[in-house]
C-alpha cells in the first residue's frame, strides 16, 4: 500500500478551521499567464489539473498589492473588485476539482524592475538598475493597507487563503535586514522595529479576513547575504508572526541577489530542510520546508525525520500534475520528475516568456496542448530514442497510435546518457527512468541495437516516419586536430576514455561547461552531499553566522585536473547559458580554478600541446595532455532524402532538425507537439 510507504506525506493536516488532505504544498511560481489575454482561463485549467492530481494546497504566482509593488511594470496586481472578479474562474475551477488554493501577495520593493519602486531606504539593489524611493510614515501605512486590501479581495474572489511573501529579499524582507533598512524611526533601527512591518501586515490581515482563512507567512530563514538576519532574529520574528495570527510558516531560502545556488540541479535534494527543522518547537503552528524536494521518497523522509509539517514543491508539479495521485496509488515510478534545470520555468520567467517545463511541455499550455485519443490509428516509426524520439513515441502511443521506436544503442536516452554523467545533472537518471516506464506503459514497440535504413522503413509500411536521429559532434578545422591527444566530448562523457591531468576544452557552450565540470570533479559530486555542498558554497553549517554566510569561507574540493575552457567569441565565457543558472556554472568552475579565455584563435595541436593566440596577442602554447572538442554538432539526416524520394511522410525533430546547440527542452516540446497533431 502506498499509504504505508508515504504515511507522513499522505497524512491530512488539521488547521483547526479546515483540513488539508495531505502534506503537499504547490509552492508559488509565476507563470506569465497572470498578465496574458485569456490568462485567467488558462490559469484555471493549470491549477485545476494539479488539484485533480491530489495536491494538498496550492499557492498562485506572486500578485502585487499595488502598482509600485509589481515585480515589473504591468505585473499582475489585485487591488480592485474588478480584478478580483477575474480570479473567480480560478478558484471555482480549483474547488470543483477538490483542491484548495491561496493567493500569494508579493511586493517587490527595491527588486521591482520599475522607476516607481519603493523601499524602507533608498538603497539600490545590486541586481536592479533602479534606485528605490524611501517611504515616509504615510507611505508605509499605505503599503500595509494595500496588503490588507489585497487579502480581503482574495477572500472575496474565493481563495482559501493568502501567502504573504516575506522572504527572498522582497519588500518585507528588506525591512527586516539592517543593510537594506537604515531608518531611524519606529520602522528601523532595532530588530523589534525592523520586524514591525511584517508583524503589522499579518496582524491587520488577520483582523480583516477573520479566523477561518489561511494565512501563510513566507519567512526568510536563511538569507545567504552578508547583512542578513541572525538565527535569534529569525526565531523572534517567527514567534511574533505566530502571535499575529499566521496559520502556517513557509521557509524562504536566499535573497535573489545571493550568490549561492538554492534550487538549481547542482543543489542537493532537500538541501535546506534542516534549516526549517531548527525552528521546530520554537513555534506551535505548522512549518513548511522547501527547495529541491522532487520525489515522494525525499518528501516522506523530510517529514519522517521531523524537519517540517509540510513540504513545498513548485517545479515538481509543473513536471507532473499527478505527482501526489501517482504516489498514493503506488505508481511513484511513473512520476515525471523535476530535474531542477530551470530552463523552461525560471529562465522563461526572467526572460519575459510563458513558464513551462522541460520534461512536461504541457505545463501552462493545458488549454491548447492535449494528448487526445486518435480517431484513426496510424502505424508510426520513430528512429532515435533520445529526448525528441522518446517524447514523440510515447505521446503518439498514449493517444492510441501503433508506434515502433528504433535505436542503434543498447539503451534509450541518446544525449540524456551524456548529460547524466555530468556532476550536478544526476537528475537525468530520473528522466530516463520515467521514459523507460512510459515506453512500457504506452505499448511502444522498442527495438534497441537496431539500425534501420531507407528500405527497412519503406518495407515497414508506416503511415508516418519520425526521424529523431540526433547529431554528430563537429570537428573544427584546426591544424593537428587528428592528433592522438584530441578527444570529442562523447569520448569523454559517454565512452569515458582516459583524460590527463591538464586539459584544454575547445568550445564554451553548454557542452563545454558540462565537460569542464566533469573533468574537475572526482568522487561524489557535492550535488549528492548536503554538507559538502554547504561547505563548497560557504554556508554556515551551524546556522550561527548572520545571514548564514557572514565570515564563512567557501571550501570547494581541489580540482581533479587543470582545465582551460576556451572560446573564439569575444563575449563573456558562458554568456549563452541559462539566465538563472549560468552564473552558478561559471562560479562553480572558477572555484575549481578553471581558466576561462575568450577571443581565442586556435593555431594548432601537436605533442607540445594546444597552440593559441588570445585577443590578437602573441602565440602561446597550453601544455596539456588532452584537447577536448566541444565545438558544436551536425544534424544526422542521412535517411531523410531517400525516404522523401520513396514518397514517405517524414518528420524531422530534435537535433536532426536543429543541431546548433543540444536542447532537450526544444526536443521534448517538438516531439510532443508533433505527436499530439498526428
Provide a role label for each language-model segment.
Residues 259-265, 286, 309-310, 416-424, ...:
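Short beta-alpha connecting loops at secondary-structure transitions
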